[in-house]
C-alpha cells in the first residue's frame, strides 16, 4: 500500500496520511444493502456501545470466505476498495463463469490465477485444508468450524503460522500471539492479507473519523460526577483514585474480560500476548 501525503496547506492536510485510492466498482449481484438500526443502540433505543453513530452509507460486498469452488481455476480481474473492512478485495472470474469476491492476498496482482481444493500447489491465494500444508506456512482466512468459512486472520496485514500437526488437530500461531488448536480438516488461504501499511494511515481531522461512523470520545475527568467516576473537582483535578476505572466503576487497566468456562478453553495452548 502506498501512503499519500498531502501538501501542507491546512492543519488537516498537514497531519493527514492516507493510502493511495483504490477505486470500487462493485458488481450488482455481489452487493446488498445494510440496515443499521440505532448505531450502538439496543432494541429499546438505549446506548449499549458508545462512540458509534453517523457515517457514510455503505453497500455490503458479499465476500467468499468459504472458498468452496473446488478445483476450478479463477483469475484476478480487479482489486477494489471495500468500505466495510480495512483490507482490499479481489474480483475473481472462475472458469465456469462464476464471479466472486475474496480478500486480497498480499502481493497478488491483476491477472494472477488462484484455485482451492485438496491437492493444489502451495501458492499465494490458494485455499486448501491444513492437513495438506507444510509446517511454517503463512496463512489467513482460517476456518474454525469445518465448512463455515474463514473466521480468523481476516484483517488487513493479518497472517497466522502453521507450527505443528498432531493427531486430528493442527497448532496455529495467530496474529495476536495466541497459540491454539484447530481441526486439520479446516481450510485456510495461503499468504498474508494485503494492505499491510494500514496502520501508517493518519486521518488528520475529526471529520474523517465521523465518515467511518465513529463519534467523538470524551474523557471522564472532564465530566460531572454523575456521568463518570473520574468527574468532578475544581479546575483540572485528578481522578481521585488509585487506578482508573470505567464509567461503570470497573477497573480499566489490566482486568481480564474473557468469560470463564468457554468451550475453547481447552483448545488455547497459550493466551494472546498483551
Swiss-Prot record:
Keywords per UniProt: Chloroplast, Plastid, Ribonucleoprotein, Ribosomal protein
GO biological process, one term: mitochondrial translation
Main localization (coarse): plastid
Region (Disordered): 1-21, 225-274
GO molecular function: rRNA binding; structural constituent of ribosome; transferase activity
Keyword Ribonucleoprotein attributed: yes
This protein's record includes keyword Plastid: yes
Cellular component GO terms, alphabetical: chloroplast; mitochondrial large ribosomal subunit
Subcellular location: Plastid, Chloroplast
The family this protein is said to belong to: Belongs to the universal ribosomal protein uL2 family.
UniProt xrefs under PANTHER family: LARGE RIBOSOMAL SUBUNIT PROTEIN UL2M (PTHR13691:SF5), RIBOSOMAL PROTEIN L2 (PTHR13691)
Quaternary structure annotation from Swiss-Prot or TrEMBL: Part of the 50S ribosomal subunit.
Protein name per UniProt: Large ribosomal subunit protein uL2cz/uL2cy
Organism: Lepidium virginicum
